[in-house]
Design a protein with these regions (language model features):
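Ser/Thr/Pro/Gly-rich low-complexity, intrinsically disordered segments
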Residues: 1-2, 11, 20
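Catalytic core of pol beta-like nucleotidyltransferases
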Residues: 48-70, 77-150, 160-248
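Cationic, low-complexity basic patches in intrinsically disordered or flexible, solvent-exposed regions
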Residues: 19, 31
Length: 248
């Protein structure tokens, strides 16, 4: 009888016993490869689930820091990594994920106080938008999105023909301000004029930041985000928010 797995030659017949062993080894190797491939799929799924779970945990820690300490999202994400003992190069949750976590945190822990605080901040924003009306002010950030608390600052984006005109207006009205540089909505450095302004409703000094943009930037600023939401609102839009008590 010819040997298995080798062929029908006399040599194969002589090596019959060995050829059977080789066949067994070949089948065993194929089984091991198939088993490894089968086991690898759940491993990949598990890894993805773990990464998703970690990202959610980072987002919830970030949300707590944003709401309870008034941190901006970028610094809050980095602080969350340190608090969790994670490497600085750990993948961070995106802003949509953080915003969802912030809304959830507010709903659970701040539902009784946050709406009043948000309204007070929007009223303060409206005051400064009316004062800076010649410079086409738009409200952005947490106060516009509806996730602000009393620890949040107000961010107004001005679109000016002359980048120095808004600063001159503050000087003419004897308003103290601190010039600084912040990150703009395209990731570029933008000049900002920071003011401390008292909110009568909160009885606190709130940071109001006037970000100076060129008039040509206004068209791009009005484009909605990937979910169709408006990123910022003009004077009329903020007035409607205060009248309707709804979020954008």
């Amino acid at each position: 009888m010819p040997g298995l797995c080798v062929g029908g030659s006399p040599a194969a017949t002589i090596l019959k016993g060995k050829s059977i062993d080789l066949c067994k080894e070949g089948l065993s190797s194929q089984l091991r490869m198939a088993t490894h491939a089968t086991m690898r799929v759940p491993s990949v799924v598990t890894a993805v689930a773990m990464n998703t779970s970690l990202s959610e945990e980072i987002a919830h820690t970030t949300a707590r820091l944003v709401v309870e300490e008034g941190l901006e999202w970028g610094p809050a994400k980095r602080r969350a990594l340190r608090e969790m003992g994670l490497p600085a190069r750990t993948s961070l949750p995106d802003n949509d994920q953080v915003e969802e976590a912030v809304r959830e945190y507010i709903q659970i822990f701040c539902a009784d106080t946050q709406p009043r605080e948000l309204r007070a901040l929007r009223q303060l924003a409206l005051v400064w938008m009316e004062r800076m009306a010649p410079f086409r002010p738009h409200l952005g950030g947490a106060v516009w999105r509806g996730t602000a608390t009393r620890l949040s600052d107000v961010y107004l984006q001005l679109f000016c023909d002359d980048p120095k005109s808004a600063e001159i207006a503050l000087i003419d009205h004897h308003v103290d301000y601190d010039p600084r540089t912040v990150t703009g909505f395209h990731g570029e450095p933008v000049e900002a004029l920071s003011i401390g302004s008292k909110s009568p409703e909160l009885n606190e000094i709130i940071g109001v930041h006037l970000l100076i943009y060129d008039l040509d930037d206004l068209r791009g600023a009005l484009k909605p985000d990937s979910k169709g939401r408006t990123r910022r609102g003009d004077l009329a839009a903020v007035r409607r928010l205060l009248e309707e008590k709804t979020d954008p």
